[in-house]
From Swiss-Prot:
Superkingdom in the source lineage: Bacteria
Biological processes, Gene Ontology terms: tricarboxylic acid cycle
An annotated Gene Ontology molecular function: citrate (Si)-synthase activity
Misc remark: Citrate synthase is found in nearly all cells capable of oxidative metabolism.
Pfam (any one): Citrate_synt
Family under the similarity heading: Belongs to the citrate synthase family.
Name of encoding gene: gltA
Protein species of origin: Bartonella vinsonii (Rochalimaea vinsonii)
Pathway(s) it belongs to: Carbohydrate metabolism; tricarboxylic acid cycle; isocitrate from oxaloacetate: step 1/2
PROSITE patterns in the record: CITRATE_SYNTHASE
Catalysed reaction equations from the record: oxaloacetate + acetyl-CoA + H2O = citrate + CoA + H(+)
Active site positions, chain numbering: 246, 304
Protein name per the record: Citrate synthase
Enzyme Commission number: 2.3.3.16
């Protein structure tokens, strides 16, 4: 309910799922329509974590890309390629194959995303570890190096987990519509998800958090904020404040409240207080929540505003 600022997954408030559950619990809920029992959760977690490895030929597949390729370009290619590696789960008329494809996508996409990141910075690929949680495993695959032991941080792991939960579902958005449109032609699940990722790439959709960080870099200094606020209010100026307002929510984005709290937890844990981008973001946040123009037009900070800052703090480059 965009007018009331409410988001439910299968009838459960997003606040409840993000605070008390983990991402795989939300996955189970979205797939099966009900929250799992303790045994069902344990079985589902084990099923996902035992399928995190990808075909070894994917390593060679990555070497066909330039190192400076945009990660979304790489992900579109990798997801499409999954249908070439996993022929036994592409028949959409078979419910069992559809579920196998779902499990493979949930389990292997973090591995492929981490490989895309590692390839872009010239580091060795890191194999997944099934004894770690879903989010901890992803962070380890992204940031561990062979020459030293990687230690998981519970605060950062929880932040990553919340980011996954908050982005798991959001009604009939552009990428969901794209996946369903591709699926209506009878295309296999991997091809459909690849199409959805291509749509997600756009700055008006999933690319908004990257665009938000680039905007903060463009502003450059807290002193220049009034200049950019004035430009945002000028109808004749093409400049737009990224990370504010939402097409669905005419009230505060419920995901933004959770992400705001998570963002500050991460920054406190990492003792980040002198980041100029963060200073700009905090000042912009204050203005947006108090300036009559923004309040009247209900241009509150959205989930992309906080997730971009959080991901940057976790160590992910803007691009």
């Amino acid at each position: 309910d965009g007018n009331k600022g409410i988001l439910l997954y299968r009838g459960y408030p997003i606040e409840q799922l993000a605070e008390k559950g983990d991402f795989l619990e939300s996955c189970y809920l979205l797939l099966y329509g009900e929250l799992p029992t303790q045994q069902e959760k344990s079985d589902f977690d084990r099923c996902i974590m035992q399928h995190t490895m990808v075909h070894e030929q994917f390593a060679r597949f990555f070497h066909g890309f330039r190192r400076d390729s945009h990660p979304m370009a790489v992900m579109v290619a990798c997801l499409g390629a999954m249908s070439a590696f996993y022929h036994d789960s592409i028949d959409i008329t078979d419910p069992q194959q559809r579920m196998i494809a779902s499990v493979r996508l949930i389990s292997k996409v973090p591995t492929l995303a981490a490989m895309a990141y590692k390839y872009s910075i010239g580091q060795a690929f890191v194999y997944p570890r099934n004894d770690l949680s879903y989010a901890a495993n992803f962070l380890r695959m992204c940031f561990s190096v062979p020459c030293e032991e990687y230690k998981t941080n519970p605060v950062l792991t929880r932040a990553m987990d919340r980011i996954f939960i908050l982005h798991a579902d959001h009604e009939q958005n552009a990428s969901t519509s794209t996946v369903r449109l591709a699926g209506s032609s009878g295309a296999n699940p991997f091809a459909c998800i690849a199409a959805g990722v291509a749509c997600l790439w756009g700055p008006a959709h999933g690319g908004a958090n990257e665009a938000c960080l680039k905007m903060l870099q463009e502003i450059g200094s807290v002193k220049r904020i009034p200049e950019f606020i004035a430009r945002a209010k000028d109808k004749n100026d093409p400049f737009r404040l990224m990370g504010f307002g939402h097409r669905v929510y005419k009230n505060y984005d419920p995901r933004a409240k959770i992400m705001q709290k998570t963002c500050h937890e991460v920054l406190k844990e990492l003792n980040i207080q002198d980041d100029p981008l963060l200073d700009i973001a905090i000042e912009l946040e204050k203005i947006a929540l108090n300036d009559e123009y923004f309040v009247e037009k209900k241009l509150y900070p959205n989930v992309d505003f906080y997730s971009g800052i959080t991901l940057k703090a976790l160590g992910f480059p803007t691009e």
